[in-house]
Amino acid sequence: MFAGSLRAQSNPSVSFTLDFPGSQPEHYTIRVAADGKATYESRGPLNSTSEATDDFHINFEASPPTRERIFALTDKAHRFSGDLESHRKNLASTGNKTLTYDDGSKPVSASFNYSNQVPVQELTRLFQDMSSTLEFARRLNFYYRYQKLALDAELKRMEELAKGNGLAELQAAEPILRQIADDPSVINVVRARAKGLTERIAR
């Protein structure tokens, strides 16, 4: 009870940052606070054919199960106070990752390429799946405004990832999904895909 009360007062946060030049996006940070307030910032080209590097920012509300899982895994990882890197040789680089726990006094961060600690692996996968959802939202917003013919292929990819449990916090993309689903100027198959994805959002 005391720990929960202290957490509620300080509203700590957990952040995940990835820096991976040449990937899409090449940089992003997700921050989730104990009260559920979350932010996502990324930088990189919109897609594989885009040459321009753009910044993207979105605020969203993390679902209670996700934020509880994030803080539970953070506690299991000792709030990142130790060395998270596996130090295994001959591992391909998958980007520099940094996890940060900030309780309002002194942030604690640890960086790694690959960790063999299960809580860290699970946090990494969860944050990467959240980034996938938010990057879909980014592209869908752009295509809806400027390139509606690209919506079908993008939503099909999104469906496939959702079916394979490769997306997290789908509700963060709900505004644009509902906008597409409710727009009679969009072809029916695209509207149906968007509607189907909104139906996957946990209530």
Report each predicted region and the residues it spans.
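A short, surface-exposed interaction/processing loop segment used at functional sites
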Residues: 38-52, 128-140
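Mature extracytoplasmic or organellar-lumen-exposed domains after removal of signal/transit peptides
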Residues: 13-18, 42-43, 59, 75, ...
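Charged, amphipathic alpha-helical segments
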Residues: 64-88
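A short, exposed loop/beta-hairpin motif centered on an aromatic-Gly-Thr core
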Residues: 56-61, 110-112
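Short, well-ordered, aromatic-rich surface patches in folded extracellular/luminal domains
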Residues: 4-22, 83-203
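A short, structured loop/turn motif at beta-sheet edges
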Residues: 35, 61-69, 101-107
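N-terminal targeting signals for Sec/Tat export/insertion, comprising classic cleavable signal peptides
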Residues: 17-42
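Acidic/histidine-rich, surface-exposed loop or edge segments in extracytoplasmic proteins
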Residues: 40-58, 157-160, 174-178
